């Protein structure tokens, strides 16, 4: 590619005498290889454009920048590469000045548009990661199309100096008809300025943007890991063994609601030692379960404050045998029970008993004072409401985490794709621009074979870009396989 003065023809002044040596029968294998690269570049970029057009999943705002990049790469493969190959095997330019200017214009415009397309793609990814909510309202196809048109407009500005340089500088040297070169091929200050604007400045900005993107994605991943640590994404399901069953038969260790009791406070503000649990992670009791192993579900729930009540006097109790497996015969009135179920705002891991086992409770397992029948029914009703509230909050939490996970995955995939595109772009173009800066100040340092190699290395970037998309994007990969009838 030829940002400033990339055409190999334009370097004849710097590498005089080398072109005749290159135009020999030994170039035939090289011409075959370069022609193959040109054909592959055209085919791959046409495949990208057809894939985006035919697959609805690829009709996204971000892929508009990919389309712009593919169009620029397609021009490089279909126009710039073939004419460069043609000029490579000729000892002199014999196609006329108009065709020469057309080739130079396409070379400069397409190569610059390719660079600018990568640049605006990087900006889009940066804003999507750094300002997701604000940029989401701004990120529309209309605005993306306007940005792309702006990049191409700036690229087409190359036509002005290519076609009209002699109008601005009357002292421009007279050009030979057998050479295809720009009027400013020997204007060092202009070439250096355009090299900085077209390559060095965008590259530095893209590297800065990508570092920011990488840090943001890494920060989001760490934040999500911390969030998942306090709010598990999935229910923790454990199979209770016989040991757990035997441990649940011990009196005083059970909660009829399947929720661990919090230590209640006495009127003086101290903790009631009777209600203090030894293990904060005690699982739900087995008093409501059937014989054998059962399944308990541990869910992050809201703490349930259970007020400590006075036990029923021994003379009022009925069914002493059942007392070992029931509520330890609490004597409660409706007012005290209404205060037994205060839900705390902070969430912690609690263990809820399986509601199905709760419904299978036998009469002997739940023998309570007859006067507490209404209280029992109301308590179950309150427990059901509490369970629904907790379940609803958990569903909302899972939904937020799911959406956040999808957004994070998109960020990571987009960052990976952009990183590959930038790496290929820099590796392909940095040799040319380094060599260009050297020969801009040292004409005798020019080597035509080296210069041609750096130019074609830049051209190959247009071949690599379409290969990067399916490697970094699953939708592109599936669409390519579908179009090419490749079975997974």
UniProtKB/Swiss-Prot annotation:
Q: Binding residues for histamine, per the UniProt record?
A: 107, 112, 198, 432
Instruction: Kindly list the places in or outside the cell where this protein is found, as annotated in its UniProt entry.
Output: Cell membrane
**Where are the compositionally biased (Polar residues) regions?**
322-337
Membrane-related topology note: Multi-pass membrane protein
Bilayer-spanning residue ranges: 30-50, 65-89, 98-123, 145-164, 189-211, 418-441, 448-470
Give the UniProt record's GO annotations in the biological process aspect: calcium ion import; cellular response to histamine; G protein-coupled receptor signaling pathway; manganese ion transmembrane transport; memory; positive regulation of vasoconstriction; regulation of synaptic plasticity; regulation of vascular permeability
Q: Which residues form the signal peptide?
A: none
Q: What Gene3D superfamilies does the record point to?
A: Rhodopsin 7-helix transmembrane proteins (1.20.1070.10)
- Phosphoserine PTM positions: 230, 344, 347, 381, 383, 397, 399
Q: Which residues lie on this side of the membrane: Extracellular?
A: 1-29, 90-97, 165-188, 442-447
Family statement drawn from the similarity comment of this UniProt entry: Belongs to the G-protein coupled receptor 1 family.
Quick one: where's region Disordered? 245-337
| Record note on domains | Histamine activates the receptor by forming hydrogen bonds with transmembrane domains 3 and 6, squashing the ligand-binding pocket on the extracellular side and opening the cavity for G-protein engagement on the intracellular side.
Specify where the region named Important for agonist binding lies, as residue ranges: 107-112, 425-429
A GO cellular component annotation in the UniProt record: plasma membrane
Q: Which gene encodes it?
A: Hrh1
- Source organism, top-level taxon: Eukaryota
**Sugar-bearing residue positions:** 5, 18
Q: Name one GO molecular function term.
A: histamine receptor activity
Cystine pairs = 100-180, 442-445
Q: Which InterPro entries match?
A: GPCR_Rhodpsn, GPCR_Rhodpsn_7TM, Histamine_H1_rcpt
Recorded protein name is Histamine H1 receptor
Residues modified as Phosphothreonine are 140, 142
What is the organism lineage in this UniProt record?
Eukaryota, Metazoa, Chordata, Craniata, Vertebrata
Q: What is the effect of changing residue 263 to L?
A: In strain: C3H/HeJ and CBA/J
């Amino acid at each position: 590619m030829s940002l400033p003065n990339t055409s190999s023809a334009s370097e004849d002044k710097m590498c005089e005498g080398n072109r005749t040596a290159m135009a020999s029968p030994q170039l035939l294998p090289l011409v075959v290889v370069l022609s193959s690269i040109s054909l592959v570049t055209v085919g791959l970029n046409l495949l990208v454009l057809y894939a985006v057009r035919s697959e609805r999943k690829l009709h996204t705002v971000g892929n508009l920048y990919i389309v712009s990049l593919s169009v620029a790469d397609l021009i490089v493969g279909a126009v710039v590469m073939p004419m460069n190959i043609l000029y490579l095997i000729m000892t002199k330019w014999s196609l006329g000045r108009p065709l020469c200017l057309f080739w130079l214009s396409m070379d400069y415009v397409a190569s610059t548009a390719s660079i600018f397309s990568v640049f605006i793609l990087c900006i889009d990814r940066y804003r999507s990661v750094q300002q997701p909510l604000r940029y989401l309202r701004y990120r529309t196809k209309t605005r993306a199309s306007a940005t792309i048109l702006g990049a191409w407009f700036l690229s087409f500005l190359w036509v002005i100096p290519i076609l009209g340089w002699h109008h601005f500088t009357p002292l421009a040297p007279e050009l030979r008809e057998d050479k295809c070169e720009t009027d400013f091929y020997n204007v060092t200050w202009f070439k250096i300025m355009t090299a900085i604007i077209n390559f060095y400045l965008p590259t530095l900005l893209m590297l800065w943007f990508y570092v920011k993107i990488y840090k943001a994605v890494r920060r989001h991943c760490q934040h999500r890991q911390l969030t998942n640590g306090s709010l598990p994404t999935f229910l923790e399901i454990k199979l209770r063994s016989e040991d757990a069953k035997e441990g649940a038969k011990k009196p005083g260790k059970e909660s009829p609601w399947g929720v661990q009791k919090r230590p209640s406070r006495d009127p003086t503000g101290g903790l009631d030692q009777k209600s203090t649990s030894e293990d904060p992670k005690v699982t739900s009791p087995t008093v409501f379960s059937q014989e054998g192993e059962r399944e308990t579900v541990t869910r992050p729930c809201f703490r349930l404050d259970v007020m400590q009540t006075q036990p029923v006097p021994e003379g009022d109790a009925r069914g002493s045998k059942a007392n070992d497996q029931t509520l330890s015969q609490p004597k409660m009135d409706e007012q005290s029970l209404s205060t037994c179920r205060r839900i705390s705002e902070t969430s912690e891991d609690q263990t809820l008993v399986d509601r199905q086992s709760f419904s299978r409770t036998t009469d002997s397992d739940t023998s309570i004072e007859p006067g507490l029948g209404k209280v029992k029914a109301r308590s179950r009703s309150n427990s059901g409401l509490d369970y629904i509230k907790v379940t609803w909050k958990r569903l909302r939490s899972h939904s937020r985490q799911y959406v956040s996970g999808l957004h994070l995955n998109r960020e990571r995939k987009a960052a990976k794709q952009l990183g590959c595109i930038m790496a290929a772009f820099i590796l392909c173009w940095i040799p040319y621009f380094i060599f260009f800066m050297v020969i801009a100040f040292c004409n005798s340092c020019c080597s035509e074979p080296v210069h041609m190699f750096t130019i074609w290395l830049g051209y190959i970037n247009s071949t690599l870009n379409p290969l990067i998309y399916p490697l970094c994007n699953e939708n592109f990969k599936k669409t390519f396989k579908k179009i090419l009838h490749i079975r997974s």
